C-alpha cells in the first residue's frame, strides 16, 4: 500500500531501484545536517542497504519519492542500542531481536514540512506492530539537528537524555526515545 501525506509524494517500502537515491540522501544528511560525514562504526547499513533492509523480513526501509527522486527515508531494524557507547541499562531494556529500532529518518531540506517524516514514522511503527517478535519501538536522535527534538517529543516518550554524558563525542547531543507500540491491525506496508 502506498501512503501520501501530500499528493506530490509517494511513500512506500524501498525497492532495489531506490538504493542509490536513499544512500545519497543519507550520506548527504551525515555531512550537511550532522557535520561529521560517514562514520563506518555507525553507518554500516548505509553501505549495505539491500542486505540490511531489503533482504531481512523483520527490517524495512521506507522512502518518499517525488518526481522519481528519493527525498525522505525511514528505516526499521531489529536492534537495540549498543553498549558502549549507550548506557548498559538501555541496551538491557531494548534488546536485539525484540526491539524495533527506528533509524535513518531523513527528509531532504526542500521537502520538509509536508508530513513526510511523521507519516513514514507511523508506517514504520505500524510495521513493527504487525511483525512478529517486536515488543518495543526505540530510537535515539541527535537533538542538534534542526527540528529533531521537537519532532520526536511530539511522537515519542523520552527514556534517557544523554546530552550530559557525551556518549557520541563532541557535536552530538543524543536523546533516547520510545514510541508506543500501535495496536496491531492490517499490515499497512504489505496491503
State where each predicted segment sits.
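Actinobacteria-biased recognition of intrinsically disordered, low-complexity terminal regions
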Residues: 1-4, 185-191
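Acetyl-CoA-dependent GNAT
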Residues: 13-104, 108-109, 121-123, 127, ...
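Short hydrophobic/aromatic beta-strand or adjacent loop that forms the aromatic wall/cage
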Residues: 59, 171-178
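Conserved hydrophobic beta-strand within the GNAT/NAT acetyltransferase core sheet
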Residues: 102-105, 137-141
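Conserved beta-strand-loop-alpha-helix junction that forms the acyl-donor binding cleft
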Residues: 112, 138-148, 166-170
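Residues forming the Rossmann-fold NAD(P)(H) cofactor-binding site
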Residues: 114, 118, 122
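Conserved GNAT acetyl-CoA-binding A-motif
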Residues: 121, 128-140
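Conserved acetyl-CoA-binding loop of GNAT-fold acetyltransferases
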Residues: 152-162
Amino acid at each position: 500500500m502506498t501512503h501520501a501525506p501530500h499528493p506530490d509524494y509517494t511513500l512506500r517500502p524501498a525497492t532495489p531501484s531506490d538504493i542509490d537515491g536513499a544512500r545519497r540522501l543519507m550520506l548527504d544528511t551525515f555531512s550537511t545536517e550532522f557535520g561529521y560525514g560517514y562514520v563506518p562504526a555507525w553507518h554500516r547499513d548505509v553501505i549495505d542497504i539491500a542486505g540490511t533492509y531489503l533482504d531481512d523480513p523483520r527490517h524495512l526501509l521506507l522512502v518518499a519519492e517525488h518526481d522519481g527522486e528519493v527525498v525522505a527515508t525511514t528505516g526499521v531494524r531489529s536492534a537495540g542500542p549498543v553498549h558502549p557507547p549507550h548506557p548498559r541499562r538501555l541496551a538491557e531494556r531494548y534488546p536485539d531481536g525484540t526491539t524495533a529500532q527506528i533509524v535513518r529518518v531523513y527528509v531532504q531540506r526542500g521537502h520538509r514540512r509536508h508530513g513526510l517524516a511523521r507519516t513514514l514514522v507511523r508506517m514504520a511503527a505500524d510495521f513493527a506492530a504487525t511483525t512478529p517478535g517486536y515488543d518495543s519501538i526505540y530510537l535515539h536522535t541527535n537533538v542538534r539537528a534542526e527540528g529533531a527534538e521537537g519532532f520526536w517529543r511530539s511522537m515519542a516518550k523520552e527514556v534517557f537524555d544523554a546530552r550530559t554524558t557525551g556518549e557520541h563525542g563532541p557535536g552530538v547531543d543524543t536523546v533516547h526515545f520510545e514510541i508506543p507500540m500501535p495496536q496491531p491491525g492490517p499490515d499497512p506496508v504489505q496491503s
